[in-house]
Amino acid sequence: MSQLNIHLKLKIVENKAFLTAEKFSMTDKVAYAEGSVVSKIIIRNERGNITLFAFDKDEFLSEHTAPYDAIVQVLDGKAEIIIDGETFELSVGESIIMPANVRHAVVAVEQFKMLLTMIK
C-alpha cells in the first residue's frame, strides 16, 4: 500500500489560519463587534485580495475610490452600497460590482457581513 502525503498551504492572517484544502463557512470566519467594522483577509497576493467584513448596525466605510473593480457579496444582513452617488440596497445573496476609480461607500442598514473580492 502506498503512502499518501497531503500538503496543505497555510495562510496566516490576523492570527487566524485558513487552510487551502479545508471546508469552512464564510459567515463563521468573521464575528460582529459592537460599534465596529471587523475585517479578515482570506487571501492577499500580487494578483488581488479577498476580504471578509462584519459591520455592526449603522457602521460604514466612508466614500473612497479603489484602483481596481471590486465585487461585494452580501453574506448576512442588509447594506446600502453607494456608487457614484447612487444608492443600492443589498440583502443576503445579492452582489454588486464597484467599478475601478469610481467613488463608493458602504453603510450597514443592520448588522451585515460581506465578502469583498478585488482582482488586479
What are these model-predicted stretches?
Residues 1-47, 82:
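A short, N-terminal "cap"/entry segment at the start of jelly-roll beta-barrel domains
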Residues 35-36, 50-66:
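Conserved short histidine dyad/triad with adjacent acidic residue
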Residues 49, 78-80, 87, 103, ...:
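Structural motif
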Residues 68-80, 84:
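Glycine- and acidic-residue-biased ligand/ion/polar-headgroup-sensing regions
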Residues 75-76, 91-92, 110:
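A cytosolic small-molecule/anion-sensing beta-strand core signal
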Residues 85-100:
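Short acidic-glycine-tyrosine-enriched beta hairpin
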Residues 100-120:
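Ligand-binding loop in jelly-roll beta-barrel domains
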